[in-house]
Amino acid sequence: IYGWGHKLNETSPLTPRPDLTNQAYTTADGTNYTSDMDAHFPVAADTVINFYAYYPYQASLSNTLASYELKDQIDIMYATPILNKGKMDVQTEANGSTAIVALSFNHQLSAITIVIKKADDIKETLVLQKVELVNYPASVRMDIQTGQLTTSDTKADYPIPVSYTH
């Protein structure tokens, strides 16, 4: 998760909050995510935070562009940004000490699985030798603020592992 703190209605420059910059969040129950860091909402009423989130997490990310190798076949997601969130705007837990910021994630790219089945009326033995995606981008960059993807100019072929059952 990234958090940019700024004055309300200010458009630039937006400075990342050091306590919210690229913090990893983990989950034990698959629903609620927490982090080891301790962040506080600004006290001033005219100071707000923009929240941006992406998956999978990259500890080395230092700007808004996350890079992924497509050969890794991983789900790539970004959250719909939550903009201009101030201390008075957040829902808190019952004791009022923990702010809840609900993020809605969108799939940008997903791992794929291909299943090829022989028709029941074919009696001959068929052997599938190869399945391959040819001439696809080798990598992609995702802007975590917009979800926009940019592919690399480098192309690659992706063999898809074949397992045979009959």
Regions found by a protein language model. Give the residues of each.
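Short, low-hydrophobicity acidic/polar segments
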Residues: 1-127
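Short, ordered, surface-exposed loop/turn motifs in non-cytosolic proteins
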Residues: 1-6, 122-153
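Conserved small/polar residues in nucleotide/adenosyl-binding loops
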Residues: 165-166
